[in-house]
Curated annotation (Swiss-Prot):
One GO process term, biological-process aspect: response to zinc ion
Disulfide bridge positions per record: none
Pfam assignment, any one: ABC-3
Chief location bin: plastid
Membrane topology: Multi-pass membrane protein
Gene3D superfamilies assigned to the protein according to its UniProt record, in alphabetical order: ABC transporter involved in vitamin B12 uptake, BtuC (1.10.3470.10)
Residue spans crossing the bilayer: 13-33, 36-56, 79-99, 112-132, 151-171, 201-221, 241-261, 267-287
Cited SUPFAM superfamilies: ABC transporter involved in vitamin B12 uptake, BtuC (SSF81345)
Annotated source species: Cyanophora paradoxa
This protein's record includes keyword Plastid: yes
GO CC annotation terms, alphabetical: ATP-binding cassette (ABC) transporter complex; cyanelle membrane
Subcellular location: Plastid, Cyanelle membrane
Name of this chain's protein: Uncharacterized membrane protein in ycf23-apcF intergenic region
Length: 299
């Protein structure tokens, strides 16, 4: 199958270029693709904003734990017929509480607590999904790998609400969050609400993960959160520039990934992730080569 697909890939490319520009506009005329593009662009935009702060606060591992911790919440919510977003959000909040509890009540470090909770919740989620699929004969693998082409109008509405909440928080608390991100001790000294900022930010991380999960699934969601932010940090000179760059990269990669997935009939989630990773490595090699050249001129 793989050899056959690779053999037909050049033919598909030639077929696309031989047709008019209307072939590229076709996906935008389909309702399910329109919803997919909107969800993907919102997820990428939020991931770029939230991911920049995640990188600077060195919370990448914690975000990975949260992304996998939502799995049992999704499974339980599906079983009881309640909105999946509530189950996922509750599971992520519980995971953060347990991580902080283990860290404060024992001599274990935070990364150890994160690893324990990450493995426990993910294992529980896989077990619950297996049991549910066996009893109800339904396919829940889209929790793991995403199902952006199966987006409903309700999903679009919930995602728009989440976008509004997150943007409202960042607009109203940007200066406080920026101060806390770069110097938590000074932020506490001048009387900023540290606990509120940290707790609210983690909840918004969970909401961003839930939105992104629709696009690329639980397993790959960390890549969408981290890679655009890391790319922005490579070339950014200020926090505002990093946020802007990572958001533009995330949105561009999401758009191009979904378009390529439709044109070549390949999964959209992995395609988006691979494009973001490719851009990161290209910029990394260019910047690294430039730095090496500069260093060689200094000596």
């Amino acid at each position: 199958m793989l050899i056959d697909y690779l053999f037909r890939l050049p033919l598909n490319i030639l077929f696309l270029f031989s047709h008019s520009f209307s072939s590229f506009l076709l996906p935008f005329q389909l309702h399910f693709m329109q919803r997919a593009f909107v969800i993907g662009l919102i997820a990428a935009l939020l991931a770029g904003i939230v991911g920049s702060f995640l990188m600077l606060q060195r919370l990448t591992l914690l975000s990975d734990a949260i992304s996998h911790s939502v799995l049992p919440g999704l499974a339980i919510a599906f079983s009881f017929g309640i909105p999946l977003i509530f189950g996922a959000l509750l599971a992520s909040i519980i995971s953060v509480i347990i991580i902080n509890w283990i860290r404060t009540e024992s001599r274990l470090k935070e990364d150890t607590a994160i690893g324990i909770v990450f493995a426990s919740f993910f294992g529980l989620g896989i077990l619950l999904i297996s049991v549910i699929q066996k009893e109800n004969k339904v396919d829940l693998n889209h929790f793991l790998f995403g199902n952006i082409l199966g987006i409903t109008s309700e999903d679009l509405q919930n995602t728009s609400i989440i976008l509004a909440i997150i943007l409202l928080f960042f607009i109203s608390c940007y200066r406080q969050l920026k101060c806390y991100t770069f110097d938590p001790i000074m932020a506490q000294t001048i009387g900023l609400p540290i606990n509120f900022l940290q707790s609210t930010f983690l909840i918004l991380v969970a909401l961003t993960i839930i939105v992104s999960m629709k696009a690329i699934g639980v397993i790959l969601v960390l890549a969408l959160l981290v890679t655009p932010g890391a790319t922005g940090l490579l070339i950014g000179k200020s926090l505002e520039y990093v946020i802007l760059t990572s958001s533009i990269i995330g949105v561009s990669c999401s758009f191009s990934g979904m378009l390529l997935s439709y044109l070549f009939n390949i999964p959209p989630g992995p395609t988006i992730v691979l494009i973001t990773s490719l851009i990161f490595f290209i910029l990394f090699l260019i910047i690294n080569k430039k730095d090496s050249t500069t260093d060689s001129k200094l000596f």
